[in-house]
Structure formats: structure tokens, C-alpha cells
Amino acid sequence: MGQMKMKDKNIFFKIVKKSILFGGIAAAGTFPVLAQSNYYFTPESSGQTKFSVTSAWSYDEAGSQPAMSAPSEWDSVYFVNNSGEKKTLELSSAETKIKEFIVAGNSIGKAEVVFGNAALDNNAVFEIDGKIKGLIGTGLGNYFTMDGSFWTTTGQTTNVTVRAKGFELGVEGYGGGYQGTDTIHTVFTVAFGSRSIITHSEFIIDGDVKLGGYGYKNQSETSLVLNVDRAVVNGVVKIQSDGMGWSNIKNSKDGMVFELGGLQLTDETHVDCGIYNNPNMGLTSTLVFKNAKGTDYKFRGNVSDFGYLSTPPANTNSKLNIVMDGEGTQRIYTYRANDLAYSTQSGTFTVNNGKFYLGNGLLREENRKASLVLNGGIFGAYNYSETEQGFAYFKTATFKSGGISVENTQLFAAQTPSLIVVTEKLSKDGTEKIKVDFTNANGVAFNPGDFEISLAEYGADYSEIDNWTEILVAADLDGFTLNEISEGIYDASGDFEGSGIENAMAVFRWVNDAANGYSLQVGLTQVPEPSAVAAIVAAAVLAFAFARRRAK
């Protein structure tokens, strides 16, 4: 028998696969497991074409090898190099499943996949069992859109979900990639939120999301635009900006919630990347970090209300809220190569769990407008270098429960720890003491003896302690117990307690200065001798017994 041609091989594999699927071949193991086929969307004409139309598919990009059927859940779909009339792939059923989805080289506005009328009155799902990949083609444009397109309806609506195992944008090239020197654009837009017929939309990635990494040395844009009600990345969002380019995720629906398992910068060469609301649209969105226990992710980039603008924003109502819900650690250092200019933080940062660190000292003073809510987790100021003092600025803050971190014990020993600054009012809500956690990044407790810090005697008067170190500043206080021990100095140990410290005790005080507000300071003393501890316990027992007798 002569050698089978590629076209004949594809046809043969399809026949075998369909025979196995539909019972034409009953004996298990008669044929080996077949690799998935690559299907190219090559419709006969422009406009909107249904997924189920066999003639819209080929086994090669040129369309010279027509497919025998539409793709199945084992097959990879390619939608590439469309620069002429707009082509739209309509999902022709409420549930569509494929292996991978690859797009590349499409001009702006020329390529999209849409949910159509089959989605109406359904919870429609487009499931990709592998990855969605936005590759860099040979030209300057790599654009693609996911959307909805519906014919006349009578009050019908739909909920839509796109779900994939992974997502990559601007990580690899296609067909040799771009070989020139001009600015290239790789933009993937999920636009369901713009359709009123779609009442709820979700974009879910069960693994990691990767932006950038192709290695282009000149100007380039890599953008994921999310206009959905809810986005979820169960893995980690990994971003880098290639060459002198920029990479970003733009939240583009008001009220959008974006849950992610961590945010990580993957290259330090040139940093111009971030997550923010689409500029000048007046949007509010929320990032919810779900970092798993034991993880510690670092990101240096522009996490702000509307990203970078070189001129004042036309709409100043944008807010990016951040919630830390995971048991792990997330660190964000607000940064952009060159200048942050009008980048602003005005949302609410809520720390419910785990550890969350923020450094935003590079923002202009007038753009530090965020609020902090400490509600069970641990928060700390942060500098990406980790050898220099970091600053976390907030307009207001509320401490309910949880703790603040003094993680860099070397900086603390030098009395220059990273500093939390509240430019207006810091409030205490509730009776629970706020922990001041000295545990370092490796989970090791702080031992002052390792840094040759002299300790005051246990029970020493605050005026006798000479190792006071400032860890927080607030212009005004509300709800704290201010027991004055001398002029302008208040005992703060009723509201704060040390943790993650050994062979020493931490005591706290507020120092009030008319010009600078209130400074929270930590002093270190020796631990009490065992006999002193016993005496303290005995005194407490006697006091309790006396109180009970008086109550009878």
C-alpha cells in the first residue's frame, strides 16, 4: 500500500474516532489512542458561522484539507490570521467542549467567538479542556474577542461561562512570530458584560494565567480585557512585560469580582504591568486573593484604580477594592518603570485572612486615597527590595481583629521598620486586641538577642525603656483606649499585643504630637522570672476570688 497523504490520514483518524465513539468498533483496544486533531476555522464567507457547520472547518490553515466534521471535545481549534472581513464563530449549542483554543494574527475587530441563540434560556458553557492561547503572529495585530450575538428575542436571557484549564497571552509565537521592530499588540477581550441579554457571565481558569514572555525586545502590548460579572483564576496570575512593552489585565465591568490564587511578577527586566479598571470609565471592581496556605507571591507593578495615565483622568470615580481571603501570603509593591503619574488607589483593602503586604509610597501624595480594614488577617507595609524601609499609605483605616506585621526584623533592629501611615483617622472597632506579629518571612520568631538589642527590665516604667521603635502613624484616633501615662504619651498595651517574639516581651505606647498625630511605638522588655509569673497568677486568682465573695 502506498504512503497515506496528510489529508487521508486526518480523514482516516476521524473515521476511526467516530467509529469508537458510536459503537462501530466494539472491541476495546483494537486501535491505539489517537491524538487530537487540529481544526482551523476557515469559513467559506465572512459574517457569522455556526460551530456545527462542517464546511467551516479545515485540517490546515490554508483550507486545502476540508474537515469531515466539526471539532469535538478531543480537538484543538485554531482561529488565526484573519485580516479581511470580520469572521464570527457562533457556538451552536448551549454546551460546547473542545481540547484547546488558539488564536493569533487576527486584525482588530476581525475575529470573535460568540454565544448565540442556542444559549438563550440556558446556562451556556464554552469549555476548553486545555488552554486558551493568544499567540503572536507574523503581523502587528493579534486581537480576539469573546462576546454574545443574538437574533431577535422575546424577553429571553442567558447566563454564560467560559472555562479553561489555563490561559496564555503573548507567551509564544505562531508561524515564526513577528520578526520586525514596530509596536505589536496582543489583546484578548471577554466582552459578555456589554450584552443586556446576558444576565450573568463568568470567565474561569482552573490553572494559571500567563501574560507576556514571548521575548520581544521593542514596544509591545499584552492585554487581557475582562468585561464579565465574575472572573476566577484558581491558579496564579503571572505577568511580565517584554522588552520595552506593557502587559496588563483591565477590569471592564462595573461591580466585577476577580478571584485569583495569587499574583506574581515573572521578570524584572522592564516592569510596566498591572491589574486595574479600564481607564476613564468610572468603574468599581474587586480583586479577591485566595492564596493557598504556604504560598508567598510577590508582585511589583501597577495595581490601582485605573492604571497609568499621563494626564488627570476624565472620570475620577474608579475604584479597585482588594480583599485578602486566602490563607497564604500576597505582596504588592505599587510600581511602574519611569513614573506612576496619575495612578491612584482609592478603594478599600480588606484583610480577612492570611498575610497581605502593600507598598505604595511611590504614588503621589494626593493619590493615596485607599482605606484599610483589618478583619482577621495580618497586614504589613512592604518594600520590594526587602532591604529598605517600605511605606503603606491609607486615607483611613479600621482595625477590627487580626494583626499588623513587623516582618523584617533587621530593619526593626535598626529602628527603621516598614511603616503604616494613616493620613486621616484610624479607628478601633471591637474589643479584640490587635496582634503585632514579629514572625519573619520564613516563619521564624524574632529573638532580640540575635540583634544585640538591650532589653529593659520587666515591669520597667515606660520612661525607662530606650528602644522604642515606630511602626505606625495616624493623624487621628477613634475607639482606642488612651490611658495617659505622661504628657502626650498613652499606654497602648490594652489594644495591642506582641506575637512571634521570643525571650522578650513587647509593650506599646502612643506618642501624640500636635504636628504629626499619633505614633504607635513598640518597646522591648525582659520576660518576667518564673517567680514573678507565679506571683502575678496568684494575685489574679486572689483578686478573682475576692470579687466573687463581694458579689455574694
Where are the regions that the model predicts?
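Short, Lys/Arg-enriched N-terminal segments with co-localized hydrophobic residues
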Residues: M1-K5
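Gram-negative bacterial Sec-dependent N-terminal signal peptides
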Residues: K7-L34, V537, V541
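Detector for repetitive beta-architecture
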Residues: N38, S76, T88, E95, ...
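Extracellular beta-strand/loop-rich repeat segments of large surface/secreted proteins
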Residues: T284-K298, K319-I322, S346-V351, L358-T469
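Short, charged juxtamembrane terminal tails flanking transmembrane helices
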Residues: R549-K552
